[in-house]
Amino acid sequence: MEALVLVGHGSRLPHSKNVVMEVAEKIKARNIYDIVEVGMMEFNEPTIPQTIKKVIDAGAKKVIVTPVFLAPGNHTERDIPKILGIYEGDDEGGHHHHHDHEHHHHHHDTTAVEIPEGVELVYRKPMGADDRIIDIVLDRANGL
């Protein structure tokens, strides 16, 4: 059984999570994966570990984790891989990215999830400057 886990960034406002949930519902409607669930990087639940545990408990033998992020960054390159137990980078200096705005990040626990024997975990890239994204940006620019 295959599960798709979409990872959203999360926000103090509901919009971010709601959009990712809507994307998940639309993917579910296409009947490609046995299970489609959402996990949030920060601020909201379910967390990534909660969601991965849920899909494994439901019988998933392959878990495809796909960030619903436009660009690679600290979350997609470090935080999410750490949670998935697949981070291979150097962690010296810890959390050393800086924002030019004042707010405190509320990251969920980044303890790696337990992946049982016999379960395959696959981690995918964020969307990037895909031509389909370009079309959406141009539609928005044209008021569509």
From Swiss-Prot:
What this protein catalyses is: Co-sirohydrochlorin + 2 H(+) = sirohydrochlorin + Co(2+); Ni-sirohydrochlorin + 2 H(+) = sirohydrochlorin + Ni(2+)
Q: Which domain of life is it from?
A: Archaea
| Top EC class for this record | lyase
Family matches, as Gene3D superfamilies? 3.40.50.1400
**CDD domains, alphabetized:** CbiX_SirB_N
Q: Which UniProt keywords apply?
A: Cobalamin biosynthesis, Cobalt, Lyase, Metal-binding, Methanogenesis, Nickel
Amino-acid positions noted as binding Co(2+) in the UniProt annotation, renumbered to this chain: 9, 75
Pathway this chain belongs to: Cofactor biosynthesis; adenosylcobalamin biosynthesis; cob(II)yrinate a,c-diamide from sirohydrochlorin (anaerobic route): step 1/10
**Which family does the record assign?**
Belongs to the CbiX family. CbiXS subfamily.
Concerning PANTHER family, the annotation shows: SIROHYDROCHLORIN FERROCHELATASE, CHLOROPLASTIC
Query: Function of this protein?
Result: Catalyzes the insertion of Co(2+) into sirohydrochlorin as part of the anaerobic pathway to cobalamin biosynthesis. Involved in the biosynthesis of the unique nickel-containing tetrapyrrole coenzyme F430, the prosthetic group of methyl-coenzyme M reductase (MCR), which plays a key role in methanogenesis and anaerobic methane oxidation. Catalyzes the insertion of Ni(2+) into sirohydrochlorin to yield Ni-sirohydrochlorin.
Quaternary structure and interacting proteins, as annotated: Homotetramer; dimer of dimers.
Stated name of the protein: Sirohydrochlorin cobaltochelatase
The lineage is: Archaea, Methanobacteriati, Methanobacteriota, Methanomada group, Methanococci
The encoding gene is cbiX
